[in-house]
């Protein structure tokens, strides 16, 4: 066989449709496509977006369903920037199929994503989030009985060096330069400014005094890793029984937890009402949160309403003084009683696992720990579709056993162990993947006076949430415990 050379190749003058390259298919995106098409996703999106396009005049736009699909790809692939999303979609035949592109169509440019986001209002993005919530609720993934609330930080697309004083518009460097001149240094160097900044007593950057010229809505805050940066505050309301996010709010980073919880709960009630799962006074839902949300005002407002609080209480030195506020005392004591029960302790453990996991998936693995957009409304539009992708991932894990494309493509390892003793014969099947591992145990106990007895134990996600063998029917012939 002769060696082929790149220099000897001649380009094709014509290519038939059958010879054009196409995707062999992706198990995750193909199944997700079936779910979206069966649910009428494109028709719903086009109907919701129709009022914001010209009725007749003008060239037809790119279908808006493609806009939301590309942002879902951003979540599943962990891509933060819209430019990166466009590059990734153009580089994959399977993603081209997921976007429903024809052979001659190109992947929309990243600038089209920005233009479409500016064209479509916030309400359309909320409606898409609600459509996905309705879809997962039809599969029984929204219980609405226990809701966990927590917040995190999202780094804004603005640097601290862009902040200026609200009163006179001076930058931080200009302020230090003026202080140096007042101290007798006519032409201060960079080292002089650093020395003056270190010696300055009042070094706290206050949002009341400073604002960013690049993103005025971003606030100075301390991030989870300890750095001080301009940021936003995403807050989740999560169904603790399934992990579905029922509300994803985005607040200013300088607002405390006790200030933002009312808006997040209002959004959760609205979204749950659309799927007939809203809490009522007769059937309240449990609200589980950490001690950052504990305050007398919050507990008093929620007591006797549609939320039954289980909010962790910080330790206070001494005795509580109520000053005649009997409603606050009753609310605090009722919350403390519910929190101390076994159900309350289990709910707090569940909150720490499920709610924190939602931030890990959306911010860290999903690529939204730092946003590349500016303006709280723009960031929230992108984040709502991002979280909708998270909820679809949970649905996909129910349907095919994998919540991300990487997990679906990862091979599962299977181990078969055979253990034999004088009185027992055991068969152990271990299936492991990136998501965890499961164990199937089948044993045969040999006794002198009997032919034998058998027992079967199934341990899904072994090591994390084991299921006792006593809960599995004995003498089972086949048990499916992984997937």
Question: At which residue positions do the language-model features occur?
Answer:
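Short, flexible loop/hinge motifs at secondary-structure junctions
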Residues: 1-22, 408
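Position-driven detector of the extreme protein N-terminus
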Residues: 2, 15, 21, 73, ...
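Intrinsic-disorder-associated interaction segments
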Residues: 6, 21, 25, 165-169
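Basic, short loop/linker segments at the boundary and entry of helix-turn-helix/winged-helix-like folds
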Residues: 22, 26-72, 77, 379
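Amphipathic alpha-helical interaction surfaces
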Residues: 73-76, 91, 95
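Anion-binding and metal-coordination hotspots
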Residues: 78-90, 101-483
